[in-house]
């Protein structure tokens, strides 16, 4: 700031205009260079930001979707807690020995009989799983 005053005083004393004009031009060049550097920096920040967004949207998202589409193993909802163990063997549940009760409780058709057998096997399997889970929790 004081350089201009000093240069103006020297110009008045010597009558030589070259020093003042040279300093004026050098400050304009400095300002232009500073503006160019600021514009370059802002451009790099913008380009980097857009490049990162494109990377996240196209490349990373594509990698995640490929992994999600092809699982390494088949997921089973049948036996969630016992994936590493085989399913327990289902033991048949014996009915009461009284024939009168057995006749009253007999299913009306073969389809009902198949359904009740499947349901009893499922219940026995579920009971077995619950017992195994409780035993594992106690250990």
UniProtKB/Swiss-Prot annotation:
Spans annotated as Disordered: 93-139
Protein name as catalogued: Putative general secretion pathway protein B
Residues passing through the membrane, by range: 28-48
Membrane topology recorded in Swiss-Prot or TrEMBL: Single-pass membrane protein
Source taxon at top rank: Bacteria
Induction description: Silenced by the DNA-binding protein H-NS under standard growth conditions.
Signal sequence, renumbered to the chain: none
Cellular component aspect of the GO annotation: plasma membrane
Keywords from the UniProt entry: Cell membrane, Membrane, Transmembrane, Transmembrane helix
Compartments where located: Cell membrane
Biased amino acid composition, Acidic residues: 110-121
Biased composition (Basic and acidic residues): 122-139
Gene that produces this protein: gspB
Function: Part of a cryptic operon that encodes proteins involved in type II secretion pathway in other organisms, but is not expressed in strain K12 under standard laboratory conditions. May play a regulatory role under conditions of derepressed gsp gene expression.
Keyword Cell membrane: yes
